[in-house]
Amino acid sequence: MDARLDPALKIAEFLLKIKAVRLDAKKPFTWASGWKSPIYCDNRRSLSHPVMRTYIRQQFVEAINREFGKPDMIAGVATGGIAHGVLVAQEMGLPFIYVRSAAKEHGMKNMVEGDLTQGRNVVVVEDLVSTGKSSLSAVASLRDAGCEVKGMVSIFTYRLKVASEAFANAKVRLHALTDYNILLEQAIVDKYITEKDLASLRRWREDPANWPEIAATKPAGAVPEKPAK
């Protein structure tokens, strides 16, 4: 990692380097939703790199203290947010719980696993926020269990309009360590993509559901956006 970079650019640089994020404007990936996307993100790869894993943990702790104040507990979202959530909880000396993607079919049929008697104020840890559907489903499960969700932190977000609206409607504040615009900025610097690729990649975020069509019909040379804050 380049020590001269600010934290958001530094994390973006490393995600690209270890191929946790892959960009390909010509051969798109297919998401579970059916969307064709020029980006694929697997932040679980960061867990295999101790230096970056530690840096992410430190940035999460700083962000939680700064943005939300110290909570009673840390909650991880299965599965990508569990390991990072445990590391954050350990660093902060806090209890840890996690939220399943679906209730168990046996036993207590829990959605939330862990001891909920140790506090009610929770900050949620995610590895990735895309549309926000699964992340906010976890928030709903925590609220149903009687928790007060102070906010959510994630390693990365695409900052899609649909996610921003969903988080606003759910009254959940999200703080991401890095995001799509910052990633593209670093990808240009490190020559992972060309300026021509950049125009197509920016158009994807405008209308991800219809991106292959708009990428083919819109002219190149989109006006650059400022990195999201």
Tell me what each language-model feature is.
Residues 72, 120, 150:
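Conserved acidic residues
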Residues 80-82:
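Conserved coil-to-alpha-helix start sites within the AMP-binding
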Residues 69-78, 153:
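Short glycine-rich phosphate-binding loop at a beta-alpha junction
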Residues 1-69:
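Active-site-facing substrate-recognition patch
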Residues 2-13, 17, 140-229:
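PRPP-dependent phosphoribosyltransferase catalytic core
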Residues 85-123, 131-137:
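Short, glycine/charge-rich flexible loops or terminal/linker lids adjacent to PRPP-binding catalytic cores
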Residues 62, 66, 86, 90, ...:
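Short, well-ordered alpha-helices that flank and scaffold nucleotide-derived cofactor binding pockets
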